[in-house]
C-alpha cells in the first residue's frame, strides 16, 4: 500500500529535519537559518523579515530547553507557526498577521 498524501507530508518534514541535523539529531543555529532560507523564502519574504535578526529571534523562541539546538519537537513547533500563518492567509488574513511568530 502506498502512503497517503498526509503520510508523505509528514515523511517529507522528517526528511527535511534530518537534512539539517547533526549526529545528535538536532539542528544548530546556522543550519536552522539555512533551512529557513532554503525552504521558506516566500514565507520570509512575505513577512518582510528576511534579516538574520528575525531568524535569530525565531531560534531563541523555539529553543525551549536553551541547549542552543533545535530538537524535533521544537522544529515541529516552528513548522506549526508557519503552517498557522498560511492557514490564516487561506481565510483572508495578511501574511504574518499574528500568532507565535
From Swiss-Prot:
Pfam families: S_100
Keywords of the record: Acetylation, Calcium, Cytoplasm, Disulfide bond, Metal-binding, Repeat, Secreted, Zinc
Keyword Methyltransferase tagged: no
S-S bonds: 47-96
Gene3D superfamilies from the UniProt entry: EF-hand
Taxonomy, superkingdom: Eukaryota
Annotated localization: Cytoplasm; Secreted
Annotated Zn(2+) binding sites: 18, 25, 87, 91
Biological process terms in GO annotation: angiogenesis; antimicrobial humoral immune response mediated by antimicrobial peptide; endothelial cell migration; epidermis development; keratinocyte differentiation; positive regulation of ERK1 and ERK2 cascade; positive regulation of granulocyte chemotaxis; positive regulation of monocyte chemotaxis
Keyword hit for Metal-binding: yes
A GO term from the CC aspect: collagen-containing extracellular matrix
GO molecular function terms noted in the UniProt entry: calcium ion binding; calcium-dependent protein binding; RAGE receptor binding; zinc ion binding; zinc ion sequestering activity
Main location: cytoplasm
Residue positions where N-acetylserine is found in the record: 2
Tissues expressed in: Fetal ear, skin, and tongue and human cell lines. Highly up-regulated in psoriatic epidermis. Also highly expressed in the urine of bladder squamous cell carcinoma (SCC) bearing patients.
Chain residues that bind Ca(2+): 63, 65, 67, 69, 74
InterPro entries (UniProt xref): EF-hand-dom_pair, EF_Hand_1_Ca_BS, EF_hand_dom, S-100_dom, S100/CaBP7/8-like_CS, S100_Ca-bd_sub
Limits of the EF-hand domain: 13-48, 50-85
Family (UniProt): Belongs to the S-100 family.
Quaternary context: Interacts with RANBP9.
UniProt protein name: Protein S100-A7
Organism: Homo sapiens (Human)
Amino acid at each position: 500500500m502506498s502512503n497517503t498524501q498526509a503520510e508523505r507530508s509528514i515523511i517529507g518534514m522528517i526528511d527535511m529535519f534530518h537534512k539539517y541535523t547533526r549526529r545528535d539529531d538536532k539542528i544548530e543555529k546556522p543550519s536552522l537559518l539555512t533551512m529557513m532560507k532554503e525552504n521558506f523564502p516566500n514565507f520570509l519574504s512575505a513577512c518582510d523579515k528576511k534579516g538574520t535578526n528575525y531568524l535569530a529571534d525565531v531560534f531563541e523562541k523555539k529553543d525551549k530547553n536553551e541547549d542552543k539546538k533545535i530538537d524535533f519537537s521544537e522544529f515541529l513547533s516552528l513548522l506549526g507557526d508557519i503552517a498557522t500563518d498560511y492557514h490564516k492567509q487561506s481565510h483572508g488574513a495578511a501574511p504574518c498577521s499574528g500568532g507565535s511568530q
